[in-house]
Curated annotation (Swiss-Prot):
Its EC number is 4.2.1.11. GO terms for molecular function: enzyme binding; identical protein binding; magnesium ion binding; phosphopyruvate hydratase activity; protein-containing complex binding. The modification Phosphothreonine is found at T26. SMART domains: Enolase_C, Enolase_N. Skeletal muscle (at protein level). The alpha/alpha homodimer is expressed in embryo and in most adult tissues. The alpha/beta heterodimer and the beta/beta homodimer are found in striated muscle, and the alpha/gamma heterodimer and the gamma/gamma homodimer in neurons. Mg(2+) 1 binds at S40. This is Gamma-enolase. Pathway: Carbohydrate degradation; glycolysis; pyruvate from D-glyceraldehyde 3-phosphate: step 4/5. It is an enzyme of class 4 (lyase). The modification Phosphotyrosine is found at Y44, Y287.
Length: 434
């Protein structure tokens, strides 16, 4: 079934910034998709097109991207007559029309909005739930419910506190099902709120962009201590582990790292990659930390390779790999990490996101599907993670509707699958063994 109409508009994301929403019509009806946006972005990501008009939304409008869809992409896709089930053909047509390596002509936010809507329409055309359609596009016969990585303490560029490292996450690997994992996560989250309130006062329980708490602490080990205390207090020491997203590119200064980067610059306090690596080793020794994302700058390849060789935990590439096959291939070659963070808007189309995922999995890596800090009510990534069988997803704390929208959709999918539902649990790094 071919596309009858495409219409894009500017809407607002969870931070109050404009983003792109696309309505796509076929004979089966209307299919709507909205595009997320990151705060700490890797320099190698596909280009997110913003208007730059400071008189409007402080320069962050997306009317140019919207116009590219309505005046250029829509007519081309409609006149092509290509069916919405042909995801790769339609995505490739948009890539050809754009003609740039990083989607800078139309903007990755324009191309992705249409690509997501096409995928939803394709599922309806095949009379399949979206997650089954995605599984078919990826050539997967399995469907696996992921372990959620709840971001319960926010720092870095996601919060107004002094904390350098961006996310401290809890992973309920010992849960019996996804629904059970949600309960465990929510209980630890509420316990953590009480722990923080008792230690730092009520105003310390304000939340960051992704729903995690943002107490004004400086020491990263203090955040880990708070999370560990909440896990123990809730009674889930045996069922819960910790993950981190350091987002180290945000505090990389002149070849070194500034763990107090939100204060005025003072080069005398900067530390080397080796010193930072030793700090992570301490974290792994003293806390149940099983996953660290972006431990070093996106171009500090030597530090990545050295650290990954010396630890037995999951090392996740985000700014390093930006969901880009070329960057992933280099990271595989240099043994820089062992897990890909999959963000659809870093690469800018469903087809390329699936290709990036398959490339990582073929090389023995784990894959974690991820939201962005600027999110919408769109739940596409919930279906994506099940269809791609990656076994792990991070989409914020169990707080804020744009985060819960994804988690709630995953609970619905698990319910729909019934006895067929399998939860990744302890095998979140390698769910194919399930």
């Amino acid at each position: 079934m071919s596309i009858e109409k495409i219409w894009a508009r500017e809407i607002l994301d969870s931070r109050g910034n404009p983003t792109v929403e696309v309505d796509l019509y076929t004979a089966k009806g209307l299919f709507r998709a909205a595009v997320p946006s990151g705060a700490s972005t890797g320099i190698y990501e596909a280009l997110e097109l913003r208007d730059g008009d400071k008189q409007r939304y402080l320069g962050k409008g997306v009317l140019k991207a919207v116009d590219h869809i309505n005046s250029r992409i829509a007519p081309a896709l409609i006149s092509s007559g290509i069916s919405v089930v042909e995801q790769e053909k339609l995505d490739n047509l948009m890539l050809e029309l754009d003609g740039t390596e990083n989607k800078s002509k139309f903007g990755a936010n324009a191309i992705l909005g249409v690509s997501l809507a096409v995928c939803k329409a394709g599922a309806a055309e095949r009379d399949l739930p979206l997650y089954r359609h995605i599984a078919q596009l990826a050539g997967n016969s399995d469907l696996i419910l992921p372990v959620p990585a709840f971001n319960v303490i926010n720092g870095g560029s996601h919060a107004g506190n002094k904390l350098a490292m961006q996310e401290f996450m809890i992973l309920p690997v010992g849960a019996e099902s996804f629904r059970d994992a949600m309960r465990l996560g929510a209980e630890v989250y509420h316990t953590l709120k009480g722990v923080i309130k008792d230690k730092y006062g009520k105003d310390a329980t304000n939340v960051g962009d992704e729903g995690g708490f943002a107490p004004n602490i400086l020491e990263n080990s203090e955040a880990l201590e708070l999370v560990k205390e909440a896990i123990d207090k809730a009674g889930y020491t045996e069922k819960m582990v910790i993950g981190m997203d350091v987002a180290a590119s945000e505090f990389y200064r002149d070849g070194k790292y500034d763990l107090d980067f939100k204060s005025p610059a003072d080069p005398s306090r900067y530390i080397t990659g080796d010193q930072l690596g030793a700090l992570y080793q301490d974290f792994v020794r003293n806390y149940p930390v099983v996953s660290i994302e972006d431990p070093f700058d996106q171009d500090d390849w030597a530090a990545w390779s050295k650290f990954t060789a010396n630890v037995g935990i999951q090392i996740v590439g985000d700014d390093l790999t930006v969901t880009n096959p070329k960057r992933i291939e280099r990271a595989v070659e240099e043994k820089a990490c062992n897990c890909l963070l999959l963000k659809v808007n870093q690469i800018g189309s469903v087809t390329e996101a699936i290709q990036a995922c398959k490339l990582a999995q073929e090389n023995g890596w784990g894959v974690m599907v991820s939201h962005r800090s600027g999110e919408t009510e769109d739940t596409f990534i919930a279906d994506l993670v099940v269809g791609l069988c990656t076994g792990q997803i991070k989409t914020g704390a169990p707080c804020r509707s744009e985060r819960l929208a994804k988690y709630n959709q995953l609970m619905r999918i698990e319910e729909e699958l019934g006895d067929e539902a399998r939860f990744a649990g302890h095998n979140f790094r390698n769910p194919s063994v399930l």
